[in-house]
Amino acid sequence: VNGPRHRTTLAHPTPELPVEDVVRAQRHYSEALGFQIGWLDPGGGIGAVSRDHVAIFFRQRSRPFEPVVHWIFAADIDATYDELRASGARIVEPLERKPWGLRQFTVEDLDGNRFYVHCD
């Protein structure tokens, strides 16, 4: 490759999580995690939610499927932890400093997908 190349700009990746029921997942993320419901495919097999700079797609899958893990940075980890606990999120690992130096907690959705919410 000779000479300078123009590089386009990319944004954050958007995960697509496997779920049994897209509408149920959207409702859970809205009520327990503070996301806004975005769109739903007319067939109901794919949909989205968003919050701040995070967007998540859901795709209906039949079990068994492999749940996924994603890391989400929280600028104010204490406030985020308190907010999600108060809203009924399923926190499966409490807020603590991990051996690798991050303060983090783990949230699990209704389909077993997990989010490691962390800060430096």
Predicted feature locations:
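N-terminal beta-strand motif that seeds the catalytic metal site of vicinal oxygen chelate
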Residues: 1-26, 68-70, 119-120
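Core segments of cupin and vicinal oxygen chelate
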Residues: 10, 16-55
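Vicinal oxygen chelate
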Residues: 12-20, 48-50, 61-87, 103-108
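Conserved active-site tyrosine of GNAT-family acetyltransferases
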Residues: 25-30, 84, 109-112
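Short, charged/polar, Gly/Pro-enriched secondary-structure boundary elements
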Residues: 53-57, 66, 112-114
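A beta-strand edge to alpha-helix "cap/lid" segment located at domain peripheries
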Residues: 74, 111, 118-120
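C-terminal structural segments of small proteins and small subunits
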Residues: 97-101, 106-108, 118
